[in-house]
Amino acid sequence: VLVHGIGPEAKEALKDAGMELQYKDGYPCVSDDALDVVQQVLCGKVNKGLVSALNQKGGKAIGLCGIDGGLLSAKTISPSYGRTGEVVKVDVTMVNSFLNQGYIPVIATVAQGADGLANVYSVSANVAAAKLAVALGAEKLIQLTDKESMLQNPDAPSAPMPELHLSKVPALIRSGAISQIMVHKVNCSVEAVRSGVKSATFLDGTVPHAILLELLSDEGIGTMLTH
């Protein structure tokens, strides 16, 4: 299962429309006007581009968004977050059906409203991926980031930290060893592991074949959260 959020394409489209995303506590604050752009780009161009790329590589992908089949339901976080919502319910019935048929679900992170205040919310891809992993009983959650955001190995600064114990996360956040941009990803992954996901790993998504190298090599190339 592949989950994606607001990437450079959506940010560029917003910029072209004269809008810019503001971030708060790791969440992009999406206005009503911005949501229209985000939904079009996220569920259209980005989602279908990923589906096409997977299919061309021999996969059998299908594009979905969190609204489809009631997959993701959300409520408002607070007025200051605009139309960015908090995921309150995950229904993986449809996802399991597609998995059983051999499809790779590719999920854009917009959700249906569950609070009567809005029909649609933009939701954090980090939160959505973590909650989906829990609901699916996933063996592994992989969060992709860039090299600058990876957790660095203190003994070899050019290499990622191979393991990170859950108990050490709060202190590393306080000290700044976990960069501000990674705090949200790390916290979501910690919650997923504590909720039953077997393991969570952070990978530099700019490395060619990063996921294969992590899954198929003995040493891996990312940082794995451990109990």
Role assignments for model-derived ranges:
Residues V1-T206, L213, E219, H227:
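Nucleotide/pyrophosphate-binding catalytic subdomain
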